[in-house]
Amino acid sequence: MKKLLLAFLYLATAALASAWQQVNEDAPEPAREFRAVWVSTVYNLDWPSRAGLSAAEQKQELLAILNKAVQLKLNAVILQIRPNGDAFYKSSLEPWSAWLSGPGVNPGYDPLAFAVQEAHRRGLELHAWFNPFRATISGRPVGRNHISRRQPGLLKKAGSTTILNPSSSAAQQHVLNVILDVVRRYDIDGVHLDDYFYPYPPNHNISDGKSPAQRRAAIDSFVQKLYTGVKKTKPWVRVGISPFGIWQPGYPEGVKAGVNAYEHLACDARKWLAHGWVDYLAPQLYWRIDSEQSFPDLMRWWSSINPARPVWPGIASARINSSEDPGRPASEIDAQIDLSRRLARQSAGQLFWSWRSIGKNAGGIQSYLARRYTSYALPPAMPWSGRIRPARPTAQGRDNGRTISLAWQPVDSSARKWAIQAGSGRSWRTVCVLPGGQSKVTLPVGLIGNAARIAIRPISACGNSGTPAVLAR
């Protein structure tokens, strides 16, 4: 009797379920926008919350960041994995970071491998952020095989810190070896550098005997070699740099700055962008819209240099109601997101500094992000790094009234991720992004809503859209 009842229930459920069949239709291109947040590890600013936490505690904190990033509909996390000549990953070249479990102390797992796996599982990109030349910080211990102990001749004193001499070919080669080692061994989506090349004033006059022009030439050479090396190793890995927000005082006309990045930091970001030595530039436009360093004026200037490569501004959510800018409202960030979209020449994007302000909901920033990011978006493609477009998969779906189960079979292995879209007519949205190795998913009916079509679209490693499988009720 029990078996008969179970069989009846199964047949009843099957009868109620409706099929989604593949049809010979297309779907609009998914929305594109780079939506990233910096997760800083130096000084335990964002993660982990303090050094010495157990592996389980560190993982729990990182998963909370990734889960919240998905909830806010961000699509990339820029994780600092080399704060000062050390590593948040297993390395034969540099010691474990003191910001993890102590100087040179194995934390009991590989944080970068864990971050990559969990980010991809959630449809997020994971960009590895390197501080290229900072070596030691005053009063902070380092591991026994730290570069400052193995090759102290490569270091220069800069105030309370030491840096690898950026003009030294041996120092540059060490940094390149470190970064390319990560590119080869980890499935990262991007390599990211910040604004620290030569030190900021008043510590910029290190005793290297080089003129500002010679320093710039050295940094230019490093940036070019880095880009070439990454693209030769894995063309789909996105290379980005986030320089100081003003190239030089007076650019654009009338803009003032206490720091001359071109002279003091040997940072010629205009040249890197113009020559295509980066896949994107993220100038740190941390000022207000109505300040002397006007956000829109600076955004326009940077975007005009090379319209073929995107400029995505760094936006200072950390300055909401901060000591640096008392009274700055979260609405300022909201307005800057809007401006960055309207002024983008190539593609839109924003990078938020940093996770702490987002995670703590400074000034109610999360509600503003929810208003701007109403559906998921894919990071913009990089057709200059590869033009492969994945073929249409075969797919089918079942709807039992509560959930929709989708399954698909790819034609080849060129899909790095899948964008699941839902819509009718011209009204479509991306409801989730899945890793390339996944071939089925079960979604709540509410996520699809009244959409008459579902599209399962393959996305290549360089972000190119493939032909979707479209399903109809």
Predicted region positions:
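Aromatic-lined carbohydrate-recognition surfaces of secreted/lumenal glycan-active proteins
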Residues: 125-137, 192-193, 215-262, 310-320
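Aromatic- and acidic-residue-enriched segments that line the glycan-binding/catalytic groove
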Residues: 87-102, 134-159, 196-213, 252-260
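Catalytic domains of carbohydrate-active enzymes, especially glycoside hydrolases
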Residues: 60-86, 185-190
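Conserved aromatic anchor
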Residues: 402-414
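Substrate-binding cleft of secreted/luminal carbohydrate-active enzymes
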Residues: 269-270, 274-291, 309-384
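Glycine-rich, aromatic-flanked loop segments that form ligand/cofactor-binding clefts
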Residues: 23, 28-36, 74-84, 108-156, ...
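Active-site-adjacent "subsite" loops/lids of carbohydrate-active enzymes
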Residues: 32, 40-60, 117, 127-185, ...
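Beta-strand-rich modules
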Residues: 443-465
